[in-house]
Design a protein with these regions (language model features):
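Conserved Class I SAM-dependent methyltransferase catalytic core
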Residues: 108-171
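C-terminal beta-strand of the catalytic ATP-binding
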Residues: 83, 171-174
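Mobile active-site "lid"/loop adjacent to the S-adenosyl-L-methionine
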Residues: 83-113
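Glycine-rich, phosphate-binding/catalytic loops in enzymes
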Residues: 46, 93-96, 149-150
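Class I S-adenosylmethionine-dependent transferase superfamily signal
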Residues: 18, 96, 117-121
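Structural motif
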Residues: 68-69, 96, 123, 147
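Conserved SAM/SAH cofactor-binding pocket of Class I
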Residues: 1-89
Length: 174
């Protein structure tokens, strides 16, 4: 069974989506926000009837959770971390401005979560295992460089339906 970790899981969309696509997967969804965690727990219980034993909700922090992971045990890590800069936070569209700042802001340069992911999560993956990250539309080059500088391999960017850079895929070297 593939082992999947969803970091900054929010309500669990990514982890539960992987589980729906790959029913044999064992997914762990990690979320720091107490408010979002309540929704995550509810979704784990109800979104995929019969899947709950293989989907675990954990209240935890991306910046420390890596310390509890054994080496080489995961097949896939997915994350849609906060990625807005402090400047971008001041110019949000009204519908986005209603979201909790904790779910959006990632420090002055918008990269604090990507730095932690690049530095601390590679070895939790089995050789060849993948990391899939949502990124902001101007972050492609910087995030790819962060990953490459921390020993990730086969790094590529995928675009969304609007043609914007949206997703980075990287692998632990084989």
């Amino acid at each position: 069974s593939p082992r999947v970790l969803d970091l900054c899981a929010g309500t669990g969309c990514l982890g539960l989506g992987v589980k729906r696509f790959c029913p044999d997967a064992q997914a762990t969804c990690v979320e720091k926000s107490p408010e979002a965690f309540r929704y995550l727990e509810q979704n784990v219980r109800t979104a995929l009837p019969g899947a709950a034993p293989a989907v675990q909700a954990v209240q935890g922090d991306l910046f420390t959770y890596w310390q509890s992971l054994p080496e080489g045990q995961l097949d896939l890590i997915v994350s849609n971390p906060p990625y807005l800069t402090a400047e971008e936070m001041q110019h949000l569209q009204p519908e986005v401005a209603q979201e909790p700042a904790m779910a959006l802001e990632a420090g002055d340069d918008g990269l604090v979560f990507y730095r932690a992911l690049a530095q601390h999560y590679r070895d939790a993956l089995r050789p060849g295992g993948a990391l899939v990250l949502e990124i902001g539309w101007q972050q492609r080059q910087t995030v790819m460089e962060l990953l490459a500088g921390n020993g990730w391999a086969d790094i590529e960017c995928r675009r969304d339906y609007g043609g914007n850079d949206r997703c980075i895929i990287a692998h632990r070297p084989k």
